[in-house]
Amino acid sequence: YPPADAGGSDSFTEADFTAHVEHLKKKLPSDDFTIVVQKPFVVIGDEPADDVREHSVRTVKWAVDKLKQEYFSKDPNEILDIWLFKNATSYERNAQLLFGDKPTTPYGYYSSTHKALVMNISTGGGTLVHEIVHPFIEANFPNCPPWLNEGLGSLYEQTGELQGRIHGFTNWRLPGLQAAITL
C-alpha cells in the first residue's frame, strides 16, 4: 500500500485500489460480501449486491461529495474500508472476527487503527455519514480537538440536502447536548 503520507487517497491510482481490493478479498469472512470501490473508500457489504452498490452511491458518494463541497479539500490519507453489515448479528460477529472488536454502539464506529468504518447498516445511514466525517477531519485538520471532530460528525447524524448543500437536521443527540449545556 502507499505510505500514509502519500498525499491523500485522491493521489492513489487505480492500481492502488485494485491491489487493496485483492488484499480485501483474502480476508472476507464469506462469499456473501460485495466489494465496491467508491473513492476515496472501498465499500464492503453482506447485503445483496444491489443494496451495497446503492449504499455506496446514495450515501457514501453523496456524503463525500457534499462534505468536500462544504469543508474538505483533501481526501483521507489512506484507502479506508467501509464495512456495511446487514444486521446486528452480522455487525457484532464480523467486528469481532475481522478486527477483534466488541462494538460499544449498536450503530457503527470508525477505527483509525484498522483503517475501517464498521457499520450496522440496518440502523440506517446516519451513523455512516457521521463516521465518514472523521477521516476527512484527520486529513484536513490533523490538530482538530476531539469535541469538534465528534461535534461535526454528530451534526450530520441525520442529513439531507437543501439548495444543493448538505444539511444536518435535528437528531437524537440534541436532548443530551441540551442537558449537558444546562449543567
Language-model segments: which ranges?
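Flexible, glycine-rich surface segments
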Residues: N149-L183
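Pan-zinc metallopeptidase signature
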Residues: E22-L24, L183
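Juxtacatalytic substrate-recognition/specificity segment
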Residues: T13, H20, S30-N149, T159-L162, ...
